[in-house]
Amino acid sequence: MHESLKKKWYVLQAFSGFESRVAQSIKEHVKLNKMNDFFGEVMVPSEEVIEIRGGQRRKSEYKFFPGYVLIHMIMTDSTWHLIRNVPRVLGFIGGKSDKPSPISDKEVDIIINRLRQIGDKPRPKTLFEPGEMIRVNDGPFADFNGVVEEVDYEKSRLKVSVSIFGRATPVELDFRQVEKN
């Protein structure tokens, strides 16, 4: 296959917050224009995180590259114009505006490996480290300060050393029961 007819990875800049919508629009434009052979995967590298708002657990999406979409495609004049005419696409990153350059296979491998490592299990948005100061905001130890001793991300629990009457007391708490100082 001729080098210019090989699919390569390109980075698109899109309106921030609209990355997923842009990726979906690209797929629809490709299908409508019957250009499936020129396009491969369109992705917005992200992971699901759990954050706690108002005492409630919520899943949200954390984008690795906010405002950017990765696209595997063969770059021709017609594919370039198709992408440039998708709403909320600001342009390609790298190279010249009319002749974008692809990102290296090494960079793509790093991104894809990172996505594989994450898997499907959402991680907590707030990460705790042993030795870190926290404040208990719920339960019998509410309003006490403590030091993180151990972190169990599988069960979303912490072992915290809370100072009660001048003595350090080990307590096991849920992520939802604490906040960072």
Swiss-Prot record:
Query: Per the record, GO CC terms?
Result: cytosol
Among PROSITE patterns, the record links this protein to: NUSG
- Domain KOW, by residue range, is 130-161
A Pfam match is KOW
Classify the source by domain of life: Bacteria
InterPro entries with a match to the protein in the record: KOW, NGN, NGN-like_dom, NGN_dom_sf, NusG-like, Rib_uL2_dom2, Transcrpt_antiterm_NusG, Transcrpt_antiterm_NusG_bac_CS
* Subunit field text: Monomer. Interacts with the transcription termination factor Rho and with RNA polymerase.
Q: What name does this protein carry?
A: Transcription termination/antitermination protein NusG
> Which lineage is the organism of this entry classified under, starting from the top rank?
Bacteria, Pseudomonadati, Pseudomonadota, Gammaproteobacteria, Enterobacterales
Q: What does this protein do?
A: Participates in transcription elongation, termination and antitermination. In the absence of Rho, increases the rate of transcription elongation by the RNA polymerase (RNAP), probably by partially suppressing pausing. In the presence of Rho, modulates most Rho-dependent termination events by interacting with the RNAP to render the complex more susceptible to the termination activity of Rho. May be required to overcome a kinetic limitation of Rho to function at certain terminators. Also involved in ribosomal RNA transcriptional antitermination.
Classification via SUPFAM superfamilies: N-utilization substance G protein NusG, N-terminal domain, Translation proteins SH3-like domain
Enumerate the UniProt keywords alphabetically: Transcription, Transcription antitermination, Transcription regulation, Transcription termination
Gene3D superfamilies, A to Z: 2.30.30.30, NusG, N-terminal domain
**Keyword DNA repair attributed:** no
